[in-house]
C-alpha cells in the first residue's frame, strides 16, 4: 500500500524558501509533497540591489524564477494571511482573489523581513525604501530623471532641490546604495552641458555615531572618512523629524528641500506573523531553537513548525548566551539548507541537527573599485575589498544562468560607457495610451 506523502508548505520565496525547497527536492526518495507560497514569482538576490541601482547589473539578472528553479515544487503565487499551528493549516490569498486553505505536516516560516519605518510626517508620500528590485530600479530612475529636470530648470533653488538626495539610515546596505547612486548622479550631470560646474548634494542621516557598523569599528571609521572625501554630507547622531512637502527637517534644526529621499533605516520581521498563533519574540521574530524548530516559551516544539532567516530568532551557539544570529543572506542560506535536511531527517524519524555557523565576515561595495571587507578578521579596503565583494556574491548567486548573466553584465560595464538610460516610463507603461485615448 503506497505511503501518503508528507505535505510540506513553505511560506516565502526568498533565500529560505528557495533553498529549503531545493534541498527537499534532493531527497527524491522520500514521499514529499512540497508547496511554496510567494506573492512574487521570483526570488531576489538582495545584496546586489545597489549594483542594480548603479546600472552595473540588469534588474532581472538578480532574480531567480521560482518555477524554473524548482522543478518538483508546487509554486503558488499568493500572500499568506494566517497560520493555525493547532489545526496545521495555512490561509492564503491567491493572486486571482479569494482565499485558499492549505493543510500541512510541516510548515516552514520563511517570510523574511520588511522595511522598518517610524511615524514620520511626509514619509509615506515622499520616501522610498531599498529592499526590492522595484525600489532599486526606481531610485536609479529618479536620480536620472531629477538630473534631467535640473538641466531644464531655470530657477536656481529648483535646480538645487532636484540635485539634492537624502538617505536615512547608515547601515552598510544604505551606504552601498548611496555610494552607487552618488556615482551615477555625477556621471549623469557630466553628460548634461546645462549643468556644467554643478555638483549633486548627497546627505546621509544616521542616528548612531558611526556608519556601516557591520564591517567592524576600524573599517567603519575608514568608510566614514572615505565617503566624506567623496563629498557626501554625513550627519551622525541625527534623525529626521519630518519630510512634508519634500522638505526634510532634521534634529539638528536644518531644513533641506530634496528631490529624492531613500529610507534604509533597518528592517523588521514580516508583520503577517502577528496574524498567526506562532510564539513570537520581543521584536516580532518567530521563537526558534538551534534546530530551527519553532518553540514555545517552555521550550517545547510547535509540532511540524520550522523557521529560518530574517523572521526567525535563532540562538547563536558560537557565542555566550543569550545571543542571536544576525539577519543576513549568509545565515539565511545556510539555515535553509540545514532546515530542509532536518525536515527530511524528521520524516525518517531521525533527530534534527543544530545550526552552528561561524561568520565568514562582511563584504561591502562602495561603487566601482571601492569597498570594505572584513573576512575572517582580515581587513581589506578599496580594490581588493571590491573584488572580494563581487567574487563572493557571484559565487553565492543562485543558478548558473544568473551567474553567467551577471558576469557578462560586469564585462560589458567595463568595455562600454556608463549606462545612463532611464526606464522610468516602465513604472507607468500605459500613460501614452491613456493620453492617446483621451484620458490623463
Locate each region found by the language model.
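FAD-binding core/adjacent interface of flavoenzyme oxidoreductases
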Residues: 1-5, 74-166, 262
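C-terminal, flexible cofactor-proximal segment of oxidoreductases
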Residues: 3, 331, 335-440
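FAD-site-proximal beta/loop scaffold in flavoenzymes
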Residues: 125-154, 248, 255-260, 264-334
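A Rossmann-like FAD-binding core segment of flavoenzymes
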Residues: 33, 73-90, 182-296, 352
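Rossmann-like dinucleotide-binding core of oxidoreductases
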Residues: 158-215, 222, 233-235, 325-343, ...
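Glycine-rich, N-terminal phosphate-binding loop of Rossmann-like dinucleotide-binding domains
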Residues: 13, 94, 111-112, 252, ...
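Beta1-alpha1 glycine-rich phosphate/pyrophosphate-binding loop at the start
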Residues: 1-82, 165, 172-215, 262, ...
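Short glycine-rich anion-binding loops that position phosphate/pyrophosphate groups of nucleotides
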Residues: 16, 112-115, 178, 267-269
Amino acid at each position: 500500500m503506497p505511503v501518503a506523502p508528507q505535505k510540506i508548505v513553505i511560506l516565502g520565496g526568498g533565500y529560505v524558501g528557495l533553498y529549503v525547497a531545493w534541498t527537499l527536492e534532493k531527497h527524491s526518495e522520500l514521499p514529499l509533497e512540497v508547496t511554496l507560497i510567494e506573492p512574487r514569482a521570483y526570488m531576489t538576490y538582495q545584496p546586489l540591489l545597489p549594483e542594480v541601482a548603479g546600472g552595473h547589473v540588469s534588474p532581472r539578472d538578480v532574480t531567480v524564477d521560482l518555477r524554473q528553479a524548482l522543478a518538483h515544487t508546487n509554486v503558488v503565487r499568493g500572500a499568506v494571511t494566517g497560520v493555525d499551528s493547532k489545526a496545521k493549516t495555512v490561509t492564503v490569498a491567491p493572486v486571482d482573489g479569494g482565499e485558499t486553505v492549505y493543510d500541512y505536516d510541516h510548515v516552514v516560516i520563511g517570510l523574511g523581513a520588511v522595511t522598518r519605518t517610524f511615524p514620520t510626517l511626509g514619509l509615506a508620500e515622499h520616501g522610498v525604501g531599498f529592499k526590492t528590485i522595484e525600489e532599486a530600479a526606481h531610485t536609479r530612475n529618479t536620480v536620472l530623471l531629477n538630473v534631467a529636470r535640473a538641466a531644464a530648470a531655470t530657477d536656481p533653488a529648483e535646480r538645487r532641490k532636484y540635485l539634492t538626495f537624502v538617505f536615512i539610515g547608515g547601515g552598510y546596505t544604505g551606504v552601498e546604495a548611496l555610494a552607487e547612486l552618488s556615482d551615477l548622479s555625477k556621471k549623469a550631470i557630466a553628460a548634461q552641458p546645462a549643468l556644467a560646474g554643478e555638483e549633486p548634494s548627497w546627505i546621509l542621516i544616521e542616528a548612531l555615531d558611526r556608519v556601516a557598523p557591520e564591517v567592524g569599528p576600524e573599517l567603519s571609521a575608514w568608510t566614514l572618512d572615505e565617503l566624506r572625501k567623496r563629498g557626501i554630507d554625513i550627519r551622525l547622531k541625527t534623525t529626521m523629524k519630518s519630510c512634508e512637502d519634500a522638505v526634510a527637517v532634521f534634529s539638528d534644526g536644518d531644513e533641506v528641500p530634496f528631490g529624492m529621499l531613500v529610507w534604509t533605516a533597518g528592517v523588521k520581521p514580516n508583520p503577517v506573523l502577528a496574524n498567526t498563533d506562532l510564539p513570537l519574540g520581543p521584536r516580532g521574530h518567530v521563537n526558534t531553537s538551534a534546530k530551527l524548530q519553532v518553540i514555545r516559551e517552555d521550550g517545547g516544539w510547535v509540532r511540524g513548525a520550522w523557521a529560518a532567516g530574517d523572521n526567525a530568532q535563532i540562538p547563536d551557539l558560537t557565542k555566550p548566551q543569550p545571543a542571536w544570529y544576525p539577519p543576513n543572506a549568509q545565515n539565511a542560506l545556510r539555515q535553509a539548507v540545514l532546515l530542509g535536511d532536518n525536515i527530511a531527517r524528521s520524516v525518517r524519524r531521525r533527530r534534527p541537527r543544530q545550526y552552528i555557523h561561524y561568520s565568514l565576515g562582511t563584504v561591502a561595495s562602495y561603487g566601482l573599485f571601492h569597498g570594505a571587507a572584513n573576512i575572517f578578521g582580515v581587513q581589506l579596503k578599496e580594490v581588493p575589498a571590491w573584488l572580494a565583494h563581487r567574487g563572493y556574491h557571484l559565487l553565492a548567486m543562485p543558478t548558473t544562468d544568473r551567474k553567467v548573466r551577471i558576469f557578462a553584465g560586469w564585462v560589458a560595464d567595463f568595455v562600454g560607457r556608463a549606462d545612463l538610460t532611464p526606464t522610468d516610463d516602465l513604472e507607468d507603461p500605459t500613460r501614452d495610451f491613456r493620453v492617446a485615448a483621451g484620458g490623463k
